[in-house]
Amino acid sequence: MNLFTDFEARIKTALEQIDLVREKRSELDFGRITVEPPRDASHGDVATNAAMVLAKPLGSNPRALADVIIAKLKEDADVADVSVAGPGFINIRLSVGYWQRLLASMINSGTDYGRSTLGAGRKVNVEYVSANPTGPMHVGHCRGAVVGDALANLLAFAGYGVEKEYYINDAGSQIDVLARSVFLRYREALGERIGEIPSGLYPGDYLVPVGQSLAADYGVRLHNMPEEQWMPIVKDRTISAMMVMIREDLAALNVHHDIFFSERTLHANGAAAIRTAINDLTFKGYVYKGTLPPPKGQLPEDWEDREQTLFRSTEVGDDMDRPLIKSDGSYTYFAADVAYFKNKFDRGFDEMIYVLGADHGGYVKRLEAVARGVSNGKAKLTVLLCQLVKLYRNGEPVKMSKRSGDFVTLRDVVEEVGRDSVRFMMLYRKNSEPLDFDFAKVTEQSKDNPVFYVQYAHARCMSVFRQAREAFPGLEVSAEDLAKAVAGIGDPAELQLVAKLAEFPRVVEAAAQSQEPHRIAFYLYDLASSFHAHWNKGKDQTELRFVNDKNRESSIARLGLVYAVASVLKSGLAITGTAAPDEMR
C-alpha cells in the first residue's frame, strides 16, 4: 500500500462530494494536487495543497475551501485529526489503526514493499560504461558504471522492462592502434627485443598475455604476414581479451550487462545498418549535401571545408547540422550513432537512457536530435552525465595516474575498500555533481560512513531476531504471524518509524521518474538514522526495547516492525547493488 497514493485518492473522493467542485469539475485540474509528507512532522502525517490549487478556478478563498474539504475528510475513520495551516495547506494526522494496517501490509509484502507498477512494463534501454576496449577499467569508469546499474535496478523495481547494455567501441582508429600495440607484444613473445614502446602505442603490461597467446597459437606465421592480413586476426583476439578483462572488472563491482553490442556489426556487410539508417533519414527529408561553416572554438574531428552529406539536425533541436558521410565517402562516427539508435528503436524500446561522462556534454543535443529524427518523436532519449570523481586518502589527493602505462584501476579501488563501499558512495551524491571519494572515510565504522551506517542497521535488525530466539527458545514466527501482531505497535516513537517506512514507495517512484538513483541512497541513510535512533531510545526506555524477555506478545509485535525495516533496507540496498549483511564484524 502506498500511503500517499491512497490518501490522494481519498482527498479526490472528498472533493467529488462537494457541490461546487462537481459543478465545475471539467474546469479543474486535479493533476496539480500534491499529497506528501509535511515539511514539519509536528504538523501531521500527510499534507495537501488541494484547497490552494482549486480555490481560484472555483472562485473561493483557499482557507474557506480548506474548511469544506476538512469537513469531508473528518468523516474518514482513518483520519485522527485534520487542520488548515498558512494560506490553505491541509495537514492530516492518521489514526493508530491506519498505521497498524499499513505496517501489516509492509510485513506481508516483505521485500516487494515499495515495488511499483509505474513503468507499466514499458521497455527502457539503459546504456552505461561503454568504455573503449583498450584496457582494464580505470577508476574514472566507476561512477558511470554504478549510476547506470543502480538506475536500471531502480527502473525495474518501478515496473519498467529494463535492458542493461554496453556499447563496444570496437570499430574506431584506436582499435588499430591497440592491435599494433599487441602485435609488438607478439613479436616480443617470439623473442624479439622491442625496447621502449613507441610513442602513440598502448604501453600497458596488460597486453603482454595477449601477445603471448598469439605467439602460442600462430608461432611466426603472423610475423611473416603483411599488416592487412594479420590486423583482423590480432584485432579479434585483442578485443576478445579486453572484453574478458572488462567483464571481470565490472563483475568485481557487481555490474552485469544483458547485452554487449559491437559497433563493428554496424559496419558489417558494407555498413548496411548505417546505410539503412541514413536512407531512413533521407526519406524523412533530414539529409542533404552541403558545407558547414567552421564552428567556433576547437574544430570537431568530422568537420571539413568540403561538401559532405549532412543530417539536418537543427530542425529537431540541435545547435548545428551534423556530418554523416565525409567528402571521401567514408562514414562519420556520428553516422554509427544514428544507426545504433535506430537499432535500439527497432528493438522496441520506448525510452533510451545513455549514462556518459561529463566530457560528453557536447553529445547531448545531437543524440536528442537523432532520437527525434529517427523515431518521429515517438521514443524518448535521456542523457545522464556523470561528473568527475576525485580520490583522497585522509584528505590528501591521490594521483589518478602512476607511471606511464599504469593507472588507478577500478579493481584497485574495489580490492582496497570493498565493492559495497564503492557502489554506495558513488551514489551518495547526485551524478551531475563532482564526487570526493576518500579511501579512509569509506572504511570507517561510524555514522559518517553512509554505507557502514546503512548496512549496520540491517545487521542490527537481524541481531534483534537472534536476541528474540535467545529470549524465547523455540520461537518461530512467520511474516503472517508478525502481520497479525501489529496491534501491539502504538507508541509515537514506533509510529514515527512506520511513517519513515511509508515514504519508501513514494521515494521509489519519484527517483524513477526523475532518473535519480541517489535518492534511494539518501533515503536509506535517513531510514537507518531513524532505526538507530529508536534503538538508542530503548537503552534508556526499556518499554521501547524490541525484545522484552518478560513479554513475548509485545516482543513479537516489535519484531514485525523490525522485519519491515529490514525488508525495506534490503530492497533499497539491492537497488543500489549493495549487500544487506546479517552480521558485521
Curated annotation (Swiss-Prot):
EC number: 6.1.1.19
Presence of keyword Acyltransferase: no
Taxonomy, superkingdom: Bacteria
Single GO biological process annotation from the record: arginyl-tRNA aminoacylation
CC terms in the record's Gene Ontology section: cytoplasm
Residue ranges annotated as motif 'HIGH' region: 131-141
Key words, A-Z: Aminoacyl-tRNA synthetase, ATP-binding, Cytoplasm, Ligase, Nucleotide-binding, Protein biosynthesis
Keyword match Ribonucleoprotein: no
Catalytic activity of the protein: tRNA(Arg) + L-arginine + ATP = L-arginyl-tRNA(Arg) + AMP + diphosphate
Database matches in SUPFAM superfamilies: Anticodon-binding domain of a subclass of class I aminoacyl-tRNA synthetases, Arginyl-tRNA synthetase (ArgRS), N-terminal 'additional' domain, Nucleotidylyl transferase
Known partners and oligomeric status: Monomer.
PANTHER family xrefs: ARGININE--TRNA LIGASE, CYTOPLASMIC, ARGINYL-TRNA SYNTHETASE
HAMAP family: Arg_tRNA_synth
Family assignment from sequence similarity: Belongs to the class-I aminoacyl-tRNA synthetase family.
Listed name of the protein: Arginine--tRNA ligase
Source organism of the structure: Rhizobium etli (strain CIAT 652)
